[in-house]
């Protein structure tokens, strides 16, 4: 009985694990859901809970020296 009570208390107070891969991805897994986008990101759509789907802007790679 003590074992059951101990396991119940331990499992009851554990916080559930958050799977960030499925919760925070948007735009066909190319963007992330955030409160606001960074300078190098563009707003592509909206996520749940009034979050914004931000996708990183890739540079063209052309540099002049």
From Swiss-Prot:
Gene3D superfamilies documented for this protein: Antimicrobial Peptide, Beta-defensin 2, Chain A (3.10.360.10)
Record keywords: Antibiotic, Antimicrobial, Defensin, Disulfide bond, Membrane, Secreted, Signal
Keyword Heme: no
Disulfide bonds, paired cysteine numbers: 26-53, 33-47, 37-54
Biological process annotations from GO: defense response to bacterium; innate immune response
GO cellular component terms, A-Z: extracellular region; membrane
One protein family per Pfam: Defensin_beta_2
Function: Has antibacterial activity. Acts as a ligand for C-C chemokine receptor CCR2.
Record-given protein name: Beta-defensin 106A
Organism name: Hylobates lar
Underlying gene: DEFB106A
């Amino acid at each position: 009985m003590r074992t059951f009570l101990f396991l119940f208390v331990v499992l009851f107070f554990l916080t559930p694990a958050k799977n960030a891969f499925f919760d925070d991805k948007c735009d066909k897994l190319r963007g992330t859901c955030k409160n606001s986008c960074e300078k190098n990101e563009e707003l592509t759509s909206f996520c749940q809970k009034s979050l914004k789907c931000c996708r990183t802007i890739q540079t063209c790679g052309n540099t002049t020296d």
